[in-house]
Amino acid sequence: MLDRLKSIEERYEKLNEYLSDPEVVNDPTKLREYSKEQSDIQETVEVYRQYRAAYDQLSEAKAMLEDKLDAEMRDMVKEEISELTEETERLEDELKILLIPKDPNDNKNVIVEVRGAAGGEEAALFAGNLYRMYSRYAEMQGWKTEVMEASVTGTGGYKEIIFMISGKGAYSKLKFENGAHRVQRVPETESGGRIHTSTATVAVLPEAEEVEIDIHEKDIRVDTFTSSGPGGQSVNTTMSAVRLTHLPTGVVVSCQDEKSQIKNKEKAMKVLRARIYDKFQREAQAEYDQTRKSAVGTGDRSERIRTYNFPQNRVTDHRIGLTIQKLDQILEGKLDEVIDALIMEDQARKLQNAK
């Protein structure tokens, strides 16, 4: 492990040299490439240097015990050794996690698709709850949320809402939200007070950059139509709504959120690119390993990953057996406790697999 860390540090120093080179500074492609690589390994290098400093201090403290010391001084050195041993062990564990191969999509923006599933109008209302939850969470992280497309129901729920969350590390946190989310509550229209169960599905796609996936204009069919509001009534007499069909894959995306056809097409292209990128990634993963599916973040949209029980103010994540009696807070966007637990479980599994 130490040899690997040393080579990472050497690479980091080499990248510093590159980024000071005028030839690189004047080449946007190289500058972006080297800056990203440096950013990806910076934390590992910083923790490695902390570890090395603590290890050197520990060695010096142990050497002091070889000298003739009075009882008080010996006790002080032993206490320092105990503290430094604990510190080096903590940093070593942190380095093991940092050396786990990273998901190349982790720092990307995400496109989130939330759809009401089983449960009719109640499922659509729950889809609205989830959209609000993710919007609040994004706001707390300092990220930006932008609605790409929404299909609103008569009661204010969503048959479907697609939105982008932009911010560093968005995919690393939100990728675990892929799957079916179940809600248990008494609908406002239920006079008998019976608890109903409904579901909404969530798909989290990393935003695909143009350099990562090549989409040719000739492969896209563009259809335009008039925008419509809840219930199908026309809200725009111009042909501003856009439907894009990627002919080779059959992926279809519609957007009518903006009044401008150009803006709708731009938004639709972002979603189309992300969906095609996600499709290729999932196909490649399935080909790589058809039988193995991780317990966390598999991306299986039919999987029931979490239950939101309103009468008991309870949220249960079924993948890791986590139950929290803070449903009200979680729906306000306070998702850290759930997401952090999922990340820790994912890291532990990867560490185990790496042994």
Swiss-Prot record:
The modification N5-methylglutamine is found at residue 233. NCBIfam families: prfA, PRK00591.1. Belongs to the prokaryotic/mitochondrial release factor family. GO terms for molecular function: translation release factor activity, codon specific. Methylated by PrmC. Methylation increases the termination efficiency of RF1. InterPro entries: PCRF, Pep_chain_release_fac_I, Pep_chain_release_fac_I_sf, Prokaryotic/Mito_RF, RF-1. One of its GO terms (cellular component) is cytoplasm. HAMAP family: Rel_fac_1 (MF_00093). This is Peptide chain release factor 1. Disulfide bonds: none annotated. Keywords: Cytoplasm, Methylation, Protein biosynthesis. Its main location: cytoplasm. It is found in: Cytoplasm. Pfam families: PCRF, RF-1. It comes from Bacillus pumilus (strain SAFR-032). It comes from the Bacteria. Peptide chain release factor 1 directs the termination of translation in response to the peptide chain termination codons UAG and UAA.
